């Protein structure tokens, strides 16, 4: 016997991923979390795919500090790559032309994501440089105070 997929309401989904029901609804409104089913009682019902997508979304937003626009770019690229993987599975192995097209499209989507990561890395490097400069100035001030000329 095959177990039915786990299904849960919005509060349970929010609890499982460490956010609030309001945040879940907000991500739905923005289109970052796909539409949901409704129970007979009219409650939103989610499954493990929704849970994983929300975990991924929250993880990448926290990790990279993306704006909602950037987060949409990231998730759009993820979704496009998932569709490409499905197309790949449906292709005959000898169809190199179509496979090459899929690979090129996948590379484009990865380039979008890499650009977002590189922007964040650049921002972090500037912040690191600023903090290191402040630390050098404070150490210099302290040294001057401890050992006046």
Protein language model features and the residues they cover:
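Residue-level "edge-of-site" marker
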Residues: 27, 40, 74
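N-terminal G-site helix/loop of the GST-like fold
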Residues: 25, 32
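The DNA-contacting recognition helix of HTH DNA-binding domains
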Residues: 21-23
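Minor-groove-contacting beta-hairpin "wing" of winged helix-turn-helix DNA-binding domains
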Residues: 41-48
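Arg/Lys-rich, alpha-helical DNA-contact motif
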Residues: 1-9, 15, 48-149
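The alpha-helix within a helix-turn-helix
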Residues: 14, 28
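Beta-hairpin "wing" of winged helix-turn-helix
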Residues: 34-41
């Amino acid at each position: 016997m095959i177990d039915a997929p786990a299904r849960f309401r919005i509060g349970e989904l929010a609890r499982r991923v460490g956010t609030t029901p309001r945040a879940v609804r907000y991500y739905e409104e923005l289109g970052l979390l796909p539409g949901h089913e409704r129970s007979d009682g009219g409650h939103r019902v989610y499954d493990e795919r929704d849970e994983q997508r929300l975990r991924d979304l929250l993880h990448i937003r926290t990790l990279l500090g993306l704006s909602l626009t950037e987060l949409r770019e990231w998730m759009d690229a993820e979704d496009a790559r998932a569709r490409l993987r499905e197309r790949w599975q449906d292709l005959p192995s000898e169809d190199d032309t179509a496979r090459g097209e899929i690979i090129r499209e996948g590379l484009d989507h990865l380039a979008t994501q890499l650009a977002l990561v590189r922007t964040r890395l650049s921002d972090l490097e500037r912040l690191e440089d600023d903090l290191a400069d402040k630390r050098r100035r404070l150490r210099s001030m302290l040294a001057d105070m401890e050992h006046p000329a």
